[in-house]
Design a protein with these regions (language model features):
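Core dinuclear metal-dependent hydrolase active-site scaffold
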Residues: 1-55, 150-214, 338-345, 351, ...
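Divalent metal-coordination and catalytic microenvironments
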Residues: 6, 22, 32, 64-65, ...
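Pre-active-site segment of Zn-dependent metallo-hydrolases
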Residues: 12-17, 24-155, 205-214, 396-404, ...
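Acidic/glycine-enriched edge-of-secondary-structure segments
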Residues: 33-37, 58, 196-202, 208, ...
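Cap/insert and terminal regions of metallo-dependent hydrolase folds
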Residues: 84, 181, 185, 206-293, ...
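Short secondary-structure boundary/capping segments
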Residues: 100-105, 111-112, 241-243, 276-279, ...
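Metallo-beta-lactamase
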Residues: 102-176, 180, 308-348
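Hard-cation-handling environments
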Residues: 245-388, 462
Length: 479
């Protein structure tokens, strides 16, 4: 018996722009409405509405507050959407801040590109000639503050593991995905009585074991599974990231180095703060100050204190006992641009955590412009980096960098720390599927480049006998 149809309008063969339409004979539900990220050309795709009739949607479901899953949400009402939006309670609390921040950034980019003042940066490999400013596509204001306000009025926050009816013959239950504060898998129960079927969207899954976040929920089964594959061809390095960070801290303390750590505000920033807090407990921080240069990262920390169900056992028990596993005396929150600029002048032998994690925008680029030509600076990289981008080149030996046309030598040391990814690796994904009591009738792999999707599909077939589909963008698939 057919359950319905799936249409993937983003994150099919790529890792951004998540947007999937689930159609049944009685309902239409959009799962995620995220932004495309990467090159300026990728970002320009955000202005093109997906092939979805928003006026006919019963509901929109958001799996978590990362911009590639929720970034276009405030466009929905302008496109005709009049239904309800569902996410976890913790995600609800973060979404308003994420969308308002996005609206401010869009306004800034619109005016900067209109008057030719858009900031830019480029890392240069040995022998690579400096170039002029990149040709930015016309900036589009996808939405502004009024649209964010309208959107927030439509959102219903739902606690984990509580079933809620969201459309005719469709019920939704969120399961902890272990990825970032508030992140969830979306489990849909479709139909009535004995004919009910389960369609499970994994969302972005976290690693099987994390010192900070809870292990992702292990589903007993589902009829149809849509699974992410960001790290579908990767297997986690066995090295302990905490010991690598301890070495970086020891050197910084000895040599009075500035350490710059590009990181995502939700997920990576909290993981790093927790690691530094553990080093402080072990008396290994050596008095170094740590600056969190991201108000959004601070909100992510607060979300974990308010919703300890997203924490791993040890930090959860600390919070419930009244403790603070993401705090230590040398931790400082940087909440304004003035404070951010000040730490460039005052940090000697300190650590700065700043966005963006891809090193394509945000305060981290200003910190790099100030310090990348200094030998007493270390840049710490972790996680996935887009090919050809600033961080990708820096990791591979870039010897110069351009900031708004000015070329400076790269004298800073670059260190990579493995084991901090907020995504499940291939082994973690296999464990997730191995817990199914009965094999799903259909598995569709999205949210990954094609090589990652193919690698995961091959291993699922070989080891678990699960046949997989790799959906193409905008092509309906009957389930």
């Amino acid at each position: 018996m057919s359950i319905g149809v799936l249409e993937f309008h983003g994150a099919a063969g790529e890792v951004t722009g998540s947007c999937t339409l689930l159609r049944t004979d009685r309902a239409r539900i959009l799962v995620d409405f995220g932004m495309f990220q990467g090159t300026p050309a990728d970002e320009a795709r955000n202005a093109v509405a997906p092939q979805v009739d928003f006026a006919l949607l019963d509901a929109i479901v958001i799996t978590h507050a990362h911009i590639d899953h929720c970034g276009r949400l405030a466009m929905a009402t302008e496109l005709g959407f009049r239904g309800r939006i569902y996410c976890t309670t913790a995600t609800h609390e973060l979404l308003g801040r994420v969308l308002r921040s996005s609206a401010r950034l869009q306004r800034a980019r619109f005016y900067e590109r209109a008057n030719g003042s858009a900031p830019w940066a480029r890392a240069l490999m040995p022998g690579e000639a400096p170039g002029g400013a990149p040709e930015f596509p016309t900036a589009h204001r996808l939405f502004d503050t009024p649209e964010v306000r309208d959107t927030m009025e439509r959102i219903e926050g739902v606690p984990l593991d509580r079933e809620v009816k969201i459309a005719p013959h469709v019920a939704l239950t969120f399961r902890n995905a272990g990825h970032i504060p508030g992140a969830a898998s979306a489990e849909f129960s479709i139909g009535v009585g004995a004919a009910r079927k389960t369609v499970l969207f994994s969302g972005d899954l976290g690693p099987d074991r994390s010192a900070l976040l809870a292990t992702p929920h292990r589903p007993a089964g589902a009829d149809v599974v849509i699974v992410e594959s960001t790290n579908g061809e990767r297997r986690r390095d066995a090295s302990d990231p905490e010991e690598t960070l301890a070495g970086i801290v020891a050197r910084a303390a000895e040599k009075k180095e500035k350490v710059i750590v590009p990181c995502f505000a939700l997920g990576r920033a909290q993981l790093l703060v927790h690691r530094f807090a553990r080093l402080r407990t072990r008396e290994l921080m050596r008095g170094l100050n740590v600056y969190v240069d991201s108000p959004m990262a601070v909100h992510g920390i607060e979300a974990l204190y308010k919703h300890p169900e997203y924490l791993a056992d040890e930090p959860r028990e600390i919070v419930r006992a009244g403790g603070a596993p993401l705090w230590f005396p040398e931790l400082h929150y940087v909440l304004s641009k003035r404070e951010s600029m000040a730490i460039d002048r005052m940090v000697h032998g300190g650590i700065i955590l700043a966005g963006s994690g891809f090193m394509d925008a945000g305060p981290v680029m200003r910190h790099l412009e100030e310090s990348i030509n200094r030998e007493d600076c270390t840049v710490v990289l972790s996680g996935y980096q887009p090919e050809g981008g600033f961080a990708w080149k820096l990791q591979r030996g870039a010897d110069r960098a351009q900031f708004n046309g000015k070329t400076v030598p790269v004298r800073a040391r670059t260190v990579r720390v493995e084991g901090l990814s907020g995504h499940a690796d291939q082994d973690d994904l296999m464990k997730w599927f191995a817990g199914f009591v009965q094999k799903p009738a259909r598995v569709l792999i999205n949210h990954g480049v094609d090589s990652a999707r193919a690698a995961l599909a091959g291993r699922l077939k070989t080891e678990l006998g699960i046949e997989c589909t790799l959906p193409a963008r905008d092509v309906p698939i009957e389930i």
